[in-house]
Amino acid sequence: MNIKTALSRIVDHLDLSTDEMRDVMREIMTGQCTDAQIGAFMMAMRMKSESIDEIVGAVSVMRELADKVELKTLDRVVDVVGTGGDGANIFNVSTASSFVVAAAGCTVAKHGNRAVSGKSGSADLLEAAGIYLNLTPVQVARCIDNVGIGFMFAQTHHKAMKYAAGPRRDLGLRTLFNMLGPLTNPAGVKHQVVGVFTPALCRPLAEVLQRLGSKHVLVVHSKDGLDEFSLAAPTFVAELKDDQITEYWVEPEDLGMKSQSLHGLSVEGPEASLALIRDALGKRKTENGQKAAEMIVLNAGAALYAADLATSLKEGVALAHDALHTGLAREKLEELGAFTAVFKVENEG
């Protein structure tokens, strides 16, 4: 099916099949569509609302066209990732949590990009920390093998996304493409914590990942609007485990944490986010640093559970707490910077 035929279907509020969506996405991702067609398609899909079949089709094409990272095993390899777009502008929780997860002995294949709507995306933060981002897939795999954590810069691994970049920017609205990033990890991880910008996406995205072969995934949105677990409010979870999806709410107290305000955790940019994270992963000299540390532990604990290193969310949080207090997470951050610096010399001379 071509994009013109698809558009005539979508404007009549008719869903595309998975195969039809694959056809259209291949057209878009191989440069065969005009910007006007892509913009119209994104807008029509948003107005109709994307079906699970359509999201599965779109994700499968993006995965197919990605520059993949080949790992020795995907067993207990995890990604902590969010759609962004929650408008909260708090520090980079998922990225900071990834270093605690690595410190706990779990392998992390982190996928991320620059900021979508916030002040600091994962790529912006890591760049501020002196981590070199323009790595080849082989170099990312070496980071993961040697440091226990590696970062896959979305725009490097999903070059075909360039064809949709202009229409996305011009529309300035959330579209199908906002939810594709977290579902298209170039290493093909089967264990994830995926934060989303609305609770309405939790179950559908869990179903998409179930169809695509994921093993243990938590798709989450907190009641105070975050695309991650919150200290300040209950968090809604759609959990895929043992090929079953269960939905539930989690309070911080359920996981051995104290509910508290997120005041002081908003940042104006990557440098401020980095300073707060370094304090949280280090000596926690400030009140905000201590609070940030607890937010990090909460989300790292969820990742350790998703990776099956813990048998429950509460046990995962306890493991993350212990890992944070070893100081190893801060060391992992610096180690990744030093390790990627070698690749910068290799790639740029």
UniProtKB/Swiss-Prot annotation:
Positions of anthranilate 1 binding: 82, 113
Binding site for 5-phospho-alpha-D-ribose 1-diphosphate: 82, 85-86, 92-95, 110-118, 122
EC number: 2.4.2.18
SUPFAM superfamilies recorded: Nucleoside phosphorylase/phosphoribosyltransferase catalytic domain, Nucleoside phosphorylase/phosphoribosyltransferase N-terminal domain
One of the record's GO molecular function terms: magnesium ion binding
Keyword Cell cycle set for record: no
Free-text function comment from the UniProt entry: Catalyzes the transfer of the phosphoribosyl group of 5-phosphorylribose-1-pyrophosphate (PRPP) to anthranilate to yield N-(5'-phosphoribosyl)-anthranilate (PRA).
Name of the protein this chain belongs to: Anthranilate phosphoribosyltransferase
